[in-house]
């Protein structure tokens, strides 16, 4: 037998399939595999894409029948102009079959006017390696791209018509695909090893009553519902004299232990951990504990409870995971946790399950207006001033309105002495006018402007008396 096994190991990988591989390599590519790009001038260059040639190599040689090796990558030039990078890169790739046959060739990749330097290097090196891979694979035969250098073949292949491949939804690799039996057994074996060493931080054991004469089985009730309905986190295990029943209960507990660890909420297990003193008080007091004699549901679950019950495992789970916990164990209708429960005493006017704008009809029913006229009334339009009003009444001629938090003050009227000067002695320049901001808080008394008879621009020209001509 050993001699036969040694002969099988020394046997070529391809064996009788080498002729089939050679037959496939001699065939030329169909129009489905050929792509074209614009070359120099108006010419069009035929080529095969990198992902297509990799798929062909896997189909011909097998997924484990060939391998690639990047021998070298060299940067030929790197130019920077106005913050843009241009890179030229050369790569050498070797393709080796399992039989030892290999092909090696060179590839080139360029990137022009790339703003980001890392992206320029990435594109240049990848394109160079892909080009070298395609040139190396074409050395094995026509089916891997060597036929694209035959001009007569390219002239005839353009006339061949073909239908594009249809999209097959059943040929997609989905997460629901079956896994091999070997991987399943390995996974189950690892899970069993993990279950033997549970997480100590996530386990919380309640101390039971130490009285040996007591025959009551204590069950911890966790109140996690807003309406006050208790929910049982984990039922107590019955300690039976029958070894077969005990083994069955232990197996079921180990099977669900991993699921409970996944459903735990880490945010509930840090500051809310129970101390040893609290655990002892919980076991001695009857405030948060129910007995199996009073609860028929618990009595139904543990009919063979003995005088020395085992320590019960108490865990905290999120409200989202409460449904899965309830499905695994029997829980009475009164203790079922309902995550969609809404108290009847609270009136829900807005649908909490959706996110949308509040309709205008709801605001109208609540006498809420969406108009903003009252806000805009506090600001004056552009180029205008707010009217001097206080409580919708005009102020007197001797009252001026101040800021919003100031009391109107009384001012004395300003007397103008326009009649004190004769028309000839009137000022030659226009009186200065004080600019008032439209939204200013302070009020400025309105000074009547005296209209001048003549307005001069620049320096006035006044002749002296002796230079005047006699009239």
Curated annotation (Swiss-Prot):
PANTHER family: DNA REPAIR AND RECOMBINATION PROTEIN RAD52, RAD59 (PTHR12132), DNA REPAIR PROTEIN RAD52 HOMOLOG (PTHR12132:SF1)
GO cellular component: mitochondrion; nuclear chromosome; nucleus
Major site of localization recorded for this protein: nucleus
One Pfam family of this chain: Rad52_Rad22
Location(s) in or outside the cell: Nucleus
Presence of the UniProt keyword DNA damage in the record: yes
General remark: Present with 1080 molecules/cell in log phase SD medium.
Composition-biased stretches (Polar residues): 182-198, 205-227
Gene: RAD52
Record flagged with keyword DNA damage: yes
Protein name: DNA repair and recombination protein RAD52
Disordered, as annotated region: 166-251, 417-471
Family: Belongs to the RAD52 family.
Keyword annotations from UniProtKB, A to Z: DNA damage, DNA recombination, DNA repair, Nucleus, Phosphoprotein
Source organism (scientific name): Saccharomyces cerevisiae (strain ATCC 204508 / S288c)
A biological process from GO: meiotic joint molecule formation
Lineage: Eukaryota, Fungi, Dikarya, Ascomycota, Saccharomycotina
